[in-house]
């Protein structure tokens, strides 16, 4: 992506690097999840240009009959939700459980996307959405009826009922979240995985 759209809009005019990379999707296992060589997120933070390297590939794999998607920038979750919906992996209108240090609930400028056309979903995901606004369009389009956000110790008390898709940002394990014991976070997420229809996991490299 070379134009100032999607995740490439952040600090675009001030940056020396003007393009970010979207890795391809492969089917594989956890062994295929590895760091690539390309910049996938780039912004200026406190006068320092951050050039975050993403994954070599985005990975789809199955474990215990569940489909799991692993990717870098969190807005890719929107594409994988639509792909999974088209494949009948979950029912439209179920709940979303979002485990993340951040709420990611900002509103995009545009909600125009054909959910039945994955090429258009790809365009929308990468050229309209960014890492902070990908949940609202899924709610507005009725893909999910509601979202439960787990971003605190209180949030981990959630005991979901009914069908849900689980969305995880690995920044839930960042140092800023260390006020919640690591094993507690890990075990709660393991419990949520057991009941999920589909699981999306963002590495969030920035």
Task: Locate the predicted segments by residue.
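Conserved alpha-helical scaffold segments that buttress catalytic/binding sites
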Residues: 1-206
């Amino acid at each position: 992506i070379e134009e100032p759209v999607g995740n490439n809009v952040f600090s675009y005019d001030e940056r020396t690097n003007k393009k970010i990379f979207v890795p391809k999707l492969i089917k594989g296992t956890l062994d295929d999840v590895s760091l690539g060589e390309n910049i996938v997120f780039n912004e200026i933070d406190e006068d320092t240009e951050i050039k975050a390297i993403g994954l070599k590939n985005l990975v789809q794999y199955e474990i215990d009959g569940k489909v799991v998607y692993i990717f870098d920038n969190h807005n890719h979750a929107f594409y994988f939700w639509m792909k999974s919906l088209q494949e009948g992996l979950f029912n439209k209108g179920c709940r979303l459980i979002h485990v993340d240090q951040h709420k990611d609930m900002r509103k995009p400028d545009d909600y125009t996307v054909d959910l039945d056309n994955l090429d258009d979903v790809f365009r929308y995901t990468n050229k309209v959405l960014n890492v902070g606004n990908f949940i609202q369009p899924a709610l507005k389009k009725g893909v999910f009826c509601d979202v439960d956000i787990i971003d605190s110790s209180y949030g981990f008390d959630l005991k979901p009922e009914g069908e849900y898709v689980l969305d995880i940002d690995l920044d839930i394990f960042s140092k800023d979240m260390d006020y919640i014991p690591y094993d507690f976070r890990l075990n709660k997420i393991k419990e949520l995985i057991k009941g999920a229809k589909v699981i999306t996991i963002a590495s969030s490299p920035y």
